[in-house]
Amino acid sequence: MNRFTVPVFVLLIFAVASASPLLHTVEADGTEVVRQRAQAHVFEWNGNASNVSVHGEWDGWVAGTPLIETAPEQWSVEMPLAPGMYCYKFVIDDVWTMDDGNPYTGYCGVTENSVARVANATLPMFSATIADDALTVLWHAGASGAGPSGTPVALNGATWDDASWTWTYDLSGLPDGKHTFHVQGEATDGTVADDLLLPFWRGPGADFVWDDALIYMLMTDRFVNGNTSNDPAPLPEAAQGADWMGGDFAGVTAHIEAGTFTDMGVNALWLTPFNTAANGTGLAADGVHEVSAFHGYWPVEPRGVDPRLGTPEELEALVDAAHAAGIRVLGDFVVNHVHEDHPYHDDHPEWFNSGCICGEANCDWTEHRLECLFRDYMPDVDWKQRNASEAMIEDVLWWIETFDLDGGRIDAVKHVDDLAITNLAVRINERFETVGTDMYLKGETAMGWAGHDLAANANEYGTINRYIGEHQLDGQADFVLYHATSDRVFTGGEEDYMHLDYWTARSQDQYVDGAVMVPFVGSHDVSRFASRADPGTADEWNQWAEQGLPGQPGTDEPYAASLQAHGWLLTIPGAPMIYMGDEYGEYGGADPDNRHMWRNATERNDREQHLHENISAIGAVRAESEALRRGGYASVHSTPDVLVYQRATADASSLVGLNRGATASTVTLDAVYADHAAVFGSPAFDATNLTLEIPAGSVVILSNESVFASNATGNETQPPDVPGCTDPAADNHDPAATVDDGSCTYPSVDVPGCTDATAENHDAAATVDDGSCTYPPVDVPGCMDVNATNYDGSATSEDGSCTYPPADVPGCTDANATNYNANATSDDGSCTYPPVDVPGCTDVNATNYDANATVDDASCTFPGPDGPTPDGNETGGEDDVTPSEPSERNERDNNAMADLLGSVGTLGSALLLGLVLMGLSWAIRRTAS
């Protein structure tokens, strides 16, 4: 994912506020510890300041900890924090500021702060590197300093070096494709180490970069039905085209293995969400029609595979087949919302916004983008809630790890807080980019094209760029280029090829450096390209049957426009995306009519099949051409109907010519192109006179790359033809054939019926099972517990085979607690929290002393003296007392006696009077005697 800075050596640790010393050598019990992970969290800041301190949640923000200037303008401090997550900020010369060196942020209350994620440093850990054919894994002791108890299972066969605490694993014997090692182990004292995931590729895929990708986007339910047993019952209330149609993982896998994607040059698949989606239907945006969740964007489970698409095992098989074929797989992650039946909505209502409905009155899509709801049954996730954001991130990590995905597409990017994208990207980098394998994150930030003035499009580019960077997305769908060209140039023709050239070039200089953008001409969100390019019709934007939906085009124009558009799309920079069916010109109106079932070669007409063959051939050339995948873009020649441009690296060059005109066009080239020769199309290229004739309505490609075979003159590079059947759908498909010789044979026309000979209504003439088979009642043993990982919906009797996910891990699950445990799955009530400050008067001499107060708020009041002080300033100092007159002294004596009597109380006064009388009586008797 991180093409902006690719780490060579990665340690499995939580991201810290800044770089920290992770390795050092210590002595433990008299035995030298070769390597130990850092035992304190390091905060760092670089810059010119008089004083720098860090304040955070760990002590309730009460006191700051000063950073020490260890070198000019380099400040740091080590803090032994307990494992958990802490909001914090730096205070730099009395100014509170975020930590620019730490991309991970979060909200504590209503304020965004930097977030320190502190790992459990007492545990051991692993780190790893790959160089050439050697995988090197290092052991880092925990607090005890203990070494490993043995070799991890994932490294079975590796060589251990006791002196360096290092395993070395020879990769040379591994087959081509993707491998993922899950390294786990424990120390000799029994302490379990933090695990390490090591995804890497061998063979041709090892040097893949995402500029090499040709992405094929498919909606699983609408691709191919490979397993009719998982088809759901029809929903009568669903509008036409808005019900489930039976496509599944098995259908995708079958076409991976048949070479359907590889033959087109496709090396990356983007599948729509496969988490369990809502049952039934929901009201469409028009408020009239009912639609189902076949698309997957209404999730009702955070980690459940939708059984209507297949089983977890079938999804694993799909990914394994793709990797074996050198194809990456991208998930589609819905992070903005859930369906109202999702458990998060019921269990944690505080995790969701209570906004208006996007697009309704006083609810603008832009102004209210962060809190508005797409529909009233789609609660909007509030990423400012830390527990919500961490749960959503953990779910994405689970999907990627469980099914060994290679990245993902993030849905509705601009509708979530910025921290959603940043924090998600940081966590994916840490977990999966451990030995240099790039995980690609592609975003959907729907923007437009604001006119011919580049300045007018600054906001369009800027909004898309906002989410791309080193700790963010790797790229996004290029919506500006799409809106500038797809309809304006290719389907409508209102703009010419000079306009096309200009805006293609702008996509190379207006986005973040290093971004891998995804250009496209069609998608699952807009009407089909072929219908938009169909002249003389006005139904291309209709979406419901009663409006009248587009039919299959009956002229050449839509297919000619599609060839021009895809010839351009597959030869410009970026990771271009083909929407399933566009490769042969699938027709349709707006959603859901743009989501027809994919059709194979036997179901296409000649125009569609010819378009498919041409687009597949261009994709195959792109797959072989380094220049077309990784080269820069340079305009060579442009007129209203003709465009010639070069794609070139330091070592390779390809020339692309597009002519949408009705007549051939001749272009004179520079001498630098004399060594080029045709690799696609039928150009007339004279290398001596440097003239290139591009036939009318055609796409041509020339290249000087040695990967394309050349003849003795070097002027033509057509490889030797291999005749045969090139259609993968045919019975006699020949993968080695390069030219179709018309020999393809196909199965007879499908006859629907029950094909199962064991069924009561078996039809011997049927060739395609239509699901009508009926059977006598029979027990089907299997796991009937819906909570089990291997739940079998078809089972009728329990056979004791149920397996379950790992037991809950008790611990503190509240991220705000000081002892928060990120690995805990159930809260055991052990959470502890920093003391909460109670303001009040803490002076025991005050009249309003508060014994519960912990912080004095200056509210104390005190009793005054018995009268005003002589000068009224209440100081009571020595200088405020003046001498008293005798009468005043007697009065004071009397007052003193009264005060004395008053102080001893009624009983005391009686006793005192008794003593006085006794004394008087004694005196009288003494006198009398």
Task: Give the predicted meaning of each segment.
Residues 319, 327, 394-397, 401-406, ...:
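Active-site-proximal helices and loops of the catalytic beta/alpha 8
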Residues 34-85, 91-119, 150-165:
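Aromatic-rich carbohydrate-binding modules that target alpha-glucans
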Residues 906-925:
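A cross-kingdom C-terminal cell-surface attachment/processing module
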Residues 209, 213, 223-403, 419-434, ...:
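Substrate-binding/active-site clefts of carbohydrate-active enzymes
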Residues 81-85, 171-178:
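Surface-exposed, short loops/turns at beta-strand junctions within beta-sandwich domains
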Residues 834-838, 859-901:
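C-terminal low-complexity, Ser/Thr- and acidic/Pro-rich disordered "stalk" regions positioned immediately N-terminal
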Residues 87-88, 126, 688-714:
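C-terminal beta-strand-rich structural cap/linker in extracellular carbohydrate-active enzymes
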